[in-house]
Amino acid sequence: MLDDLDAVLLEFANASRTVGESVGFIFDFDGTLAPIVESPSKARMHPLFVPLLRRIISSYDLAIVSGRPIDFLLEQFKFLASQTSNFRVRLFGHYGFESSDLEGLSIERRVIPAGELEKLEEFRNRWKRMSFPEVAFEDKGVSFGLHYRGAPQIRQPLGAWISQELAQLQGLIIRPGKMVFEVAPASMPSKEVVVNELLSFTPRVVFSGDDYGDLGVFRLLRLDNYSKRCLSILVANASETPDELAETCDLKTQSPAELALVIDRLLGLLDQS
């Protein structure tokens, strides 16, 4: 297994050296850089990534593409703001709806139609009249997360109720995740849109993700024009990771800690090249 891992990493590093193209790293946050926890507010990046990310931005482009709000990401990655970098470093929140530099000085937001935001508020009102006491309601500003990690048995009735409501509230979509349903405006961008845009700046990319929201990126990087110059790494939880993700990645790790070791190994090979 380690031989196979080294072979894949070495092939990517050697190809990067041969063509002389710049390399960028793109990471999801929850489940990728940070272990999944029962309460979203308690999620924190694995400590192994602190020195790794410092090392990355000293030599490579870095992007964090997450479903989290940009304010949350700015807080999590503020330790990088004091480090000078000559490379592109950008945070993308709400799947790319908003983005920022590390200092929060240049926050940009895409336009969400007012009608969709009104429907989102109507969904909130309908939720208040429902009785799912086991569900933690997360207000993310331009989307809502309905977390049922404490009661996985209600996934089916909760999902059915959300689908029923969204059938009446045209302009909203449901995004399933690990023990969560996210309700968002239909015009909210997806991660693959953001990554596709980033690839126009950084031709060779290492992407790591763990959930349904990352599936589009894994599929994108499988396309012929990307597969030879990109490396996709899945962080898999055997009980929660969708099968489709395992079928579309180049490498699979079992935890954020293991991912950190793989990235460290890859950085060593890239530095040699």
Task: Locate predicted features.
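Mg2+-dependent phosphoryl-transfer enzymes with acidic/Ser/Thr/Gly-rich catalytic loops
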Residues: 1-6, 20, 185, 192-273
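Non-catalytic pre-domain segments flanking phosphatase-related domains
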Residues: 1-29, 33-38, 48, 55, ...
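Alpha-helix termini
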Residues: 14-17, 78-85, 222-228
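Residue-level marker for buried hydrophobic side chains located in beta-strands
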Residues: 25-27, 91, 206-208
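Active-site phosphate-binding/coordination module
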Residues: 36, 44-137
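A structural signal for isolated positions on well-ordered beta-strands in alpha/beta enzyme cores
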Residues: 61-63, 90, 145, 206, ...
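Structural recognition of alpha->loop->beta junctions
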Residues: 81-98, 168, 245-260
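Conserved acidic, metal-coordinating active-site core of Asp-based
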Residues: 130-221, 228-230
